[in-house]
Regions:
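Long, well-ordered mid-to-C-terminal structural blocks that present hydrophobic/aromatic surfaces
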Residues: 19-70
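Solenoid-like repeat scaffolds
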Residues: 4-15, 40-52, 76-88, 116-125, ...
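Structural motif corresponding to the intra-repeat A-B loop/turn of tetratricopeptide repeats
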Residues: 25, 32, 67, 102, ...
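Terminal, low-structured helical/coil segments at or just beyond the last alpha-helical repeat
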Residues: 147-176
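"A position-specific structural signal for the A-helix of alpha-solenoid helical repeats
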Residues: 17, 23-24, 57-63, 90-101, ...
Length: 176
């Protein structure tokens, strides 16, 4: 009996690890603007995660948005916003993307900027960096030079912080 439980646990852990890796690969593909690979990795994710994980839902919407498949992007946004348990970060992000599709740039920017603040407040640096990446594109499109400079500065600070953290980790490993 214990061996059977161990085997089942191992299978569940392997499935979860696969999901984590694929989720990160989808995000990396988005950040690198390699949408074809993003869709490929998304297709490899187990269906149960595609509906339960709002990060993956967001990545899926962004992929469809960036390849100009607005119909599917809106469909996934509508589905997500109809869920009462959705958090404020995702709700604002999805509403911002909907405004973006509907050519309401000012409202879209306002919603997406709020996501940056929510992510930072929650200590979710990776989400904040994703928001900055999108804001960078929006500010370019809307010719908002003063905000664009601020985003570039924030992105640079994040990269410096990430680099500093890596150096600290390396020193810690060498000391051990």
């Amino acid at each position: 009996m214990n061996l059977k439980l161990l085997k089942e646990s191992k299978i569940r852990n392997e499935e979860f690890l696969k999901y984590c890796i694929l989720s990160n690969l989808v995000l990396i593909s988005l950040l690198q603007k390699n949408y074809e690979n993003g869709f490929k990795y998304l297709g490899m994710v187990d269906q149960k995660y595609l509906e339960d994980d709002y990060d993956l839902v967001l990545y899926r919407i962004l992929l469809h948005l960036f390849v100009k498949d607005y119909t599917l992007a809106k469909k996934y946004i509508r589905q997500s916003l109809s869920n009462n348990s959705i958090g404020k970060y995702y709700k604002n992000f999805f509403q911002g993307l909907k405004y973006l599709i509907d050519n309401k740039q000012e409202k879209a920017i306002e919603r997406i900027e709020s996501c940056y603040n929510l992510a930072l407040t929650a200590g979710e640096v990776d989400r904040a960096m994703l928001v900055l990446k999108l804001l960078n594109e929006l500010y370019l499109d809307c010719r908002l030079q003063n905000k664009l400079r601020k985003v570039k500065e924030l992105q640079e600070n994040f990269y410096k912080m990430s680099y500093a953290n890596q150096i600290i980790e390396d020193i810690g490993l060498k000391l051990n």
